[in-house]
């Protein structure tokens, strides 16, 4: 089992999004993921989730794992769900993933566990 965690100030993501708009979103979110954005807190949560997912691999966001190798969606109970690309799943021998995202007091945090 490996674990990754990321925390970010919601205001930081909000500022970047205000400055760069859709160009910023297109750099790290697929069109399907962009539909999940309801407010700055959910946007920051998506950022934290992708960062945490890359850290769980032990590599961070880099040439081995891009933002688009990580897909965030919702399950039938509206809980966040994580899926890695086939390349990542195979190269890192991943059989299970778990993602938790929370927002409080101006911060978004995400924790990812992979087996």
Curated annotation (Swiss-Prot):
GO terms for cellular component: cytoplasm. It catalyses: apo-[ACP] + CoA = holo-[ACP] + adenosine 3',5'-bisphosphate + H(+). Mg(2+) binds at residues 6, 51. GO terms for biological process: fatty acid biosynthetic process. One of its GO terms (molecular function) is holo-[acyl-carrier-protein] synthase activity. It holds the Pfam family ACPS. SUPFAM superfamilies: 4'-phosphopantetheinyl transferase. HAMAP family: AcpS. Transfers the 4'-phosphopantetheine moiety from coenzyme A to a Ser of acyl-carrier-protein. This is Holo-[acyl-carrier-protein] synthase. It comes from Campylobacter jejuni subsp. jejuni serotype O:6 (strain 81116 / NCTC 11828). The gene is acpS.
